[in-house]
């Protein structure tokens, strides 16, 4: 009897294994399912239209402007944190920190958020341009200050033209600068000359783009006295 039980158990195991094997044979690779979650706009178009109208009315009125800094990805967004459309509607300006590298989806979202009176600014960080030059110059001792001015001018022009190329609503100039107190005379003159060249190109751009927004972000006390009057050209 004991032996019969063993044989019966062995037969049962074989049958179960055979069923599992045959079911595995019929398995198919999983397929992704596109699930669409309707947006507020799709669920209630009229209510959304009323909301947009009231939002624009608020932003057209007198209020404290809200700026946010945004590290936009070089490729198309893969999650909500990389999307312009996910930023709060109360924001007025989004400053893109990677203005030279815009994906097609990010460009499309720049257009989409304008319906909420959210505008995008191309961020030009002068210190980054200086650092580019310093990295270039440290490997070549023969480069001169004239070469530095030429390089900085070319990079500045290349950054300014992005506003037209990508359809930004304006430019934010990020200029930290340095304290001029205690600077040696030759260093001071170089500092002033580079500053003057940079801002003169920005103001030339401004003359040709009166319909765009120009914002200065930095320390006013680090501007040379002869460059102070250019602040009137900013929004």
Residue ranges with predicted function:
Residues 1-7, 15-58:
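Bacterial Sec-dependent N-terminal signal peptides
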């Amino acid at each position: 009897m004991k032996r019969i039980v063993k044989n019966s158990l062995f037969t049962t195991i074989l049958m179960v294994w055979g069923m599992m094997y045959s079911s595995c044979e019929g398995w198919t690779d999983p397929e992704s399912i596109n699930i669409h979650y309707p947006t507020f706009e799709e669920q209630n178009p009229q209510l959304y239209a009323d909301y947009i109208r009231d939002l624009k009315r608020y932003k057209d009125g007198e209020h404290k402007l809200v700026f946010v800094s945004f590290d936009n990805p070089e490729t198309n967004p893969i999650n909500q944190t990389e999307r312009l459309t996910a930023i709060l509607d109360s924001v007025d300006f989004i400053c893109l920190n990677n203005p030279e590298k815009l994906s097609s989806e990010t460009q499309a979202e720049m257009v989409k958020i304008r319906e909420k009176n959210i505008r995008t600014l191309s961020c030009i960080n002068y210190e980054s341009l200086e650092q580019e030059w310093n990295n270039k110059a440290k490997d070549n001792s023969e480069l001169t200050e004239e070469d530095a001015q030429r390089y900085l001018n070319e990079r500045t022009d290349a950054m300014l033209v992005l506003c037209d190329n990508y359809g930004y609503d304006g430019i934010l100039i990020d200029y930290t600068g340095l304290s001029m107190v205690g600077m040696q005379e030759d260093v001071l003159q170089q500092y002033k000359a580079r500053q003057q060249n940079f801002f003169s190109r920005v103001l030339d751009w401004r003359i040709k783009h009166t319909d765009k927004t120009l914002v200065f972000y930095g320390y006013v006390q680090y501007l040379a006295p002869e460059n102070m009057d250019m602040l009137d050209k900013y929004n």
